[in-house]
Amino acid sequence: MIMLILRTTNMDIYFVRHGQTMGNLAKRHQAEHTPLSSLGREQASNAAKEVAQLNPTHLISSNLVRAIETARPIAETTNLDITIEQNFAELFRPKYLHGKHHLSPQSIFYYALWFFGIENRKLAGESYEHIRQRITVAKNILQRYPKNATIVVVSHSVFINLFLAHLCRARALSVFSLLGFVSKIVRIPNGSITHVAYDSDAKEACKWSVVRKTTETNF
C-alpha cells in the first residue's frame, strides 16, 4: 500500500499505534511490559517503511514496552533517536485488571469509576479527568517543536482516540459520545498511522486538525 503524503506548512504529527501483542489478540488488559507478538514485530517493520516516506524530523514513543519495540525499527529506518515520553502512554489501568477481558465485570466497574472521575493510581487506575490533563500536557510538548516539524508519535489506541476527541475540546464527552468513542477504539488497527496537523499561525481558536484518519500499513 502506498501512503498518501500530504505536504503542508503546518507541523505534521503522525500517530502510529504500536504493533500487535498477545493481549490485543485476546482482548485483555495489559501490563506495561507486554512485548510485541511475531505479527506485531512485522507490523512495526511495515510501519517503519511507511514512516520513512514521510521524512520525519522527530520520533517520540510512549514509555511502554510495546510502543518502544514498535519505535525501534522506525528509528533504524529514519536514523532518528527515540524520545521516550510517558505522557503519550496508554490509559493507566489498575493492576487487578491485568489479564482480564475488556468486557469482564471488573472492567465494567473500572470504566464507571474512570468516567465519573474516581481515581486511585494504585487501586482504580487513571480517571477520565486525569488523562484529559495528560493530553493537554502532550499537546504542549508537541507545540514546542519547530513549526514545520514532522513528528512521529508511537502510542496506543485509547490514547490516540482520546487525543483526537479532545483536539479542540477540553471538557468531557457525554456518555452517549463515549459509546461512539468505544467503537472507534476497535477500528484503529495495530501498526496504523493517523495524521494530525498543528498550525501555530491559524486564526481559528483551535489550531489543531485531523488531516487523515487511520491508514493501515501493509501486513
Task: Please annotate each region the language model reported.
Residues 1-56, 72, 77, 203-219:
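An N-terminal RHG(E/S)-centered segment typical of histidine phosphatases
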Residues 2-10, 84, 90-102, 165-219:
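Acidic, low-complexity terminal tails and accessory targeting/binding regions
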Residues 13, 149-157:
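Generic beta-sheet signal
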Residues 53-55, 144-149:
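Glycine-rich phosphate-binding loop signature in dinucleotide/nucleotide-binding domains
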Residues 61-62, 133, 154-155:
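Short beta-strand scaffold positions
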Residues 48-119:
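Phosphate-coordination/substrate-recognition cap region in phosphate-metabolizing enzymes
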Residues 120-147:
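Internal catalytic-core helix/loop-beta-alpha segment
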